[in-house]
Amino acid sequence: MNAENKPTNFIEEIIEDDLKNGLSKEDLRFRFPPEPNGFLHIGHASAICLNFGLGEKYGQPVNLRFDDTNPAKEEAKYVDAIKEDVKWLGYQWDELRFASDYFQELYDWAVQMIKDNKAYVDSQSSEEIAQQKGSPTQPGVDGPYRNRSVAENLALFEGMKNGKYGASEHVLRAKINMQSTNMLMRDPIMYRVVNRSHHRTGDTWKIYPMYDWTHGESDYIEQISHSFCTLEFLPHRELYDWFLDQVVDPKKIRPKQREFARRNVSHTVTSKRKLQKLVEQGVVNGWDDPRMTTISGLRRRGYTAAAIKNFAASIGIAKRDNLIDMNHLEFHLRDDLNKAANRVMCVLDPVKLVITNYPEGKEELLDAENNQEDETRGYRKVPFSREIYIEREDYKEQANKKFFRLSNGREVRLKNAYIIKAEGCIKDDQGNIKEIHATYDIDSKSGSGTEASMRRVKGTLHWVSASHALPVEVRLYDRLFTVPSPDTDKEKDFMEFVNPQSLEVVTAMAEPAMKDLKIGETVQFQRMGYFCVDSDTTENLMVFNRTVTLRDTWAKVDV
């Protein structure tokens, strides 16, 4: 085995062992099986990268299969959103499948199991079924309908299929072992009546298969060789195999279920119920709110597919659930955007600065490098004039030696422009600074080659020409929760940890070239972070989302 094909995790070791034991490489087939009842999140992204990554490594197909067995919660809009997310991550499935494609075959197999006395119709209430199943420390007991005749079971099951009965009258259960130490093996439900229209099959079916019955059989129909699930499905593996035993042809590939750990990201929640609560209570503005770790939210915030894939690759595949610091994801985002994003200047909290010795009415076009990491990006022209905007925090009337920005009597360089010295400021009646006065060194123009231009000063500030400034709306997004694990506190609801400062909206002043940016395009606001053009942008107002700061601002907070 060459180094390129050497296993990098225990999942690949499983596959390599199977290949050594006689499984043909051509028989490898994988799948990603989401339920279309919500939007995918960062945890799903890791599973997508795992399965499609295996397909790429071994050069074998990966199916996208929708586990659409619950018409009460599933919608076509989720199917479309999930397909878009997978494509955006850079993957292409081999076959698009739906569990609903197999409803007839699953039904036929269930009928055969009834005939083989391995399934029966139970007419108990859900409460009665739960009670007679026992507990982890107490074995279950046989229910009163467990030994119904085959003929009666067939008639009842057909009646369920034809809509003869209500939702709570009957269920079909597998006949396994009510004393099993694995409660999932205590005659699990295979079918229930659901009087709801299905997003694909309409009103054709009145009964719908349960997940455990559908999953393994769908894998078998598609001839999936390896079915990878998260750790909560480990107890389900015994049932997965038992159901396969009822239908498998030994001449065909028998799917193998194996489990890996969830990779949770700090300061987030991924439970669909909790994400739904955030949306419904107006904490966020929809499923694609840039504070959400849904794939659509991350995409809108300005995350790149490369950053998410590199993140997934870097944390690997584990056997124990773990919490990954959000900073690790942000590291890969910064690393990608540092190379991909052009630099621009935008002042988030502007205060006017007047260069008193610069000629009134004079304007210049200065050269500014688009990306110092990539010389091929070239330069752009940035207008300069007597009045400019700088960040309010970049000026203090009096400052100590550790303040390397602008203060009275001290010099700083304006990025791509001149060295200036602060002379004083004008304040309003409340004592707020409304205008700064400075002088410039006419010979210090950046790139001019003069001795003055090569003078070293400790601070460099970004700025925007006041007469050319483009007002823009900037949404300063931060982490949605104030603690790393908001949903693990046993005494407090996760909503109590919502960060009240997760969004601040400001009107900023941007250099005029930014008006040509397209929705979804990400740039670096120099010294401030990476920002993405939001879909709320209109012809009259550009809107930017803060994708990520230039450095981790939470490192000290979480210590």
Model-inferred region functions:
Residues 253-332:
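Long, charged, mostly alpha-helical binding arms that flank functional sites
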